[in-house]
Amino acid sequence: MRVRYKPWAEDYLKDHPELVDMDGQHAGKMTEWFDKTQPIHIEIGSGMGQFITTLAAQNPHINYISMEREKSIVYKVLDKVKEMSLTNLKIICNDAIELNEYFKDGEVSRIYLNFSDPWPKNRHAKRRLTYHTFLALYQQILNDEGDLHFKTDNRGLFAYSLESMSQFGMYFTKINLNLHQEDDGSNILTEYEKKFSNKGSRIYRMEAKFHSQK
């Protein structure tokens, strides 16, 4: 997705330090950032925030983190958080490679990867969020019962991710090869998902865990 640069976005985000971490001020203190101590779920690459804000509104007993590096998108997530008065959702404006700088070992209960960039060229495989270096970060911060939820419309990325996770020592608790035909009604749409599923795109989804989190 091409992002149109918003020169004012950075200042807008900096005006809300209680909701947005721009420079790691809450690194290692995620639990303390929230009003209540509750399980933490993360979405990496939240886009405009429809998915994560819907989850937060539906589940006040869970604390959510939206992690998105593009400042010109993050402001839309912030707008939704303010409009919906969500106290259980915070935003990190940074790259996923910094995850273990923010979260302690075993601090997270769930990670969502929704419609991540497929980086289709082989030379860019290291940038895929299901490449083994990222999986190692997820394993580090997830607790023993924690899991990873992955959703994409890119068949190649889905196949790659299944293989990458299997080779890393993960197992799958759920796999959907055509989510919108198999959905039990619990699926929450992202903005991207709604747009492309209406055009007939097939959506792939999986849930996975590590055999040994540590």
From Swiss-Prot:
It comes from the Bacteria. Keywords: Methyltransferase, S-adenosyl-L-methionine, Transferase, tRNA processing. GO terms for molecular function: tRNA (guanine(46)-N7)-methyltransferase activity. S-adenosyl-L-methionine binds at E43, E68, D95, D117. It holds the Pfam family Methyltransf_4. Gene3D superfamilies: Vaccinia Virus protein VP39 (3.40.50.150). Catalyzes the formation of N(7)-methylguanine at position 46 (m7G46) in tRNA. This is tRNA (guanine-N(7)-)-methyltransferase. It comes from Staphylococcus aureus (strain MSSA476). The gene is trmB.
